Regions:
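Conserved small-residue-rich beta-alpha loop and adjacent elements
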Residues: 30-95
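Conserved nucleotide-cofactor-binding alpha/beta core module
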Residues: 97-99
Length: 222
């Protein structure tokens, strides 16, 4: 794995961990003046499954953003399900999983993966909750099993972004934000709104410039 990619994952890990560590709940226990003992006890889930998209793109960020909150919360068993691509796991995704201490990894994806971690198989024990984004089929499967397992309140759909910018906005950054969502899939919806014609023209030029540097330009252009 490229050392720059490793370094980026390491930096992202510590930044995300720092943020979520500030969110950690604390147990509460006190006795009021009537001698009543009142408590609030924080009990983390026993197990969660991270669904990490695969196919033609890789998302080590999905590993970090879903695993780290579970780590901070104290979840004991964190597993990863990832379909990979043509039978291979992406090195960056595997490195992110290693960074998060995840050793239980299954190369499966789609609705069958959701079913496996919900109800269990001969080799996979069921979990308490599924987190992480997927395509339309994965989202449909999550909604279908929602009565039997914990799932996010809003399942993921096609990527969308709406940016409102003005003359003070950086065209390079705006273009990067648009492309960052557009490259996810063919159904992504990316919109830029601005009253400044000059900015719009600069962003268009910047988009074409940046598309030449990414491997998923054909997807982003759609």
């Amino acid at each position: 794995l490229n050392k720059n990619v490793k370094s980026a994952i390491d930096q992202a890990y510590y930044r995300i961990y720092k943020f979520h560590s500030l969110q950690k709940f604390k147990n509460i226990s006190y006795t009021d003046k009537y001698k009543n003992k009142l408590e609030y006890k924080y009990i983390p889930l026993a197990s969660v499954a991270l669904y990490v998209p695969g196919s033609t793109a890789s998302y080590p960020s999905s590993v970090l953003h879903n695993a780290i909150p579970a780590i901070v919360a104290g979840v004991k068993r964190i597993i990863m399900i990832n379909p990979g691509y043509k039978g291979n796991q992406n090195p960056a995704v595997l490195y992110a999983a290693k960074k998060c201490g995840i050793s239980e990894i299954y190369s499966i994806g789609g609705p069958s993966a959701i079913s496996a971690v919900t109800y269990g198989t001969k080799k996979i024990k069921p979990v308490d909750k599924i987190v992480g984004p997927g395509n339309a089929y994965v989202s449909a499967a999550q909604r279908y099993v929602s009565g039997d397992i914990g799932i996010p309140s809003l399942t993921a759909g096609p990527s969308e972004v709406l940016i409102v910018a003005d003359k003070n906005s950086n065209p390079e950054w705006v273009a990067s934000d648009l492309i960052g969502q557009a490259e996810h899939d063919n159904l992504a919806q990316c919109i830029l709104i601005s009253k400044d014609r000059g900015l719009l023209d600069k962003v268009k030029i910047e988009i074409q410039k940046q598309l030449k540097t990414i491997s998923r330009a054909s997807v982003a252009r759609k």
